[in-house]
Amino acid sequence: DYLFGRGIDFEIINYCLEQELIIESLPYHNAVFIGYDENKEPKYAAYRATNQSRIMGDCTGSKKQYSFRLTAENTGEVHLFECAIDLLSYATLMKLEGKDWRQLNLVSLAGVYSPKQKIEDSKVPVTLGRLLEKDKTIRRIVLHLDNDIAGRKATKALQTILSDKYEVVDDPPQYGK
């Protein structure tokens, strides 16, 4: 109900439930977003309250390099989001535009960080670093980070440190943060 209430497409929700990418925790009924390694072992989990409270975070022991994702192989590009909900919203929008969301490489960064004072010294997020190491076909990185201060700073940092090797596109949400 929570994800559907957020406007996420029913087919996408069902896919995530069937693949155990999203589960419901008990007794609080939080939505839990799971990331897996290559052996289909869960390595990352983020939770989000499904009620009006803003309780959310990473589960203890989570490894961000395996963050929540919906991946397609050999697409040549990756779409990056601050969180799982943003990723699922984008997949829904693509479906509404008639595009096959299953053919897109969608990855949550599991949050963004403040770049270094000297922006060139900023580091690539572990999630993205691992993905770029594993998938040598990626040439284009599309950033769908929020329009808030943290999202804009992280976008600027990633554009600065990655643009010598990749085409880096800034495509923030048109509405909302």
Locate the predicted segments by residue:
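Basic, glycine-enriched DNA-binding surface that flanks or lies within the catalytic cores of DNA
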Residues: 1-71
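Terminal peptide-recognition signature
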Residues: 3, 33, 82, 90, ...
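Flexible, charged surface loops at secondary-structure boundaries
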Residues: 26, 70-75, 133-137
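Short active-site oxyanion
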Residues: 75-79, 140-141
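Acidic, divalent-metal-coordinating active-site segment for phosphoryl/phosphodiester hydrolysis
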Residues: 85-86, 154
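Short, well-ordered amphipathic alpha-helices
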Residues: 86-95
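TOPRIM fold recognition
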Residues: 94-177
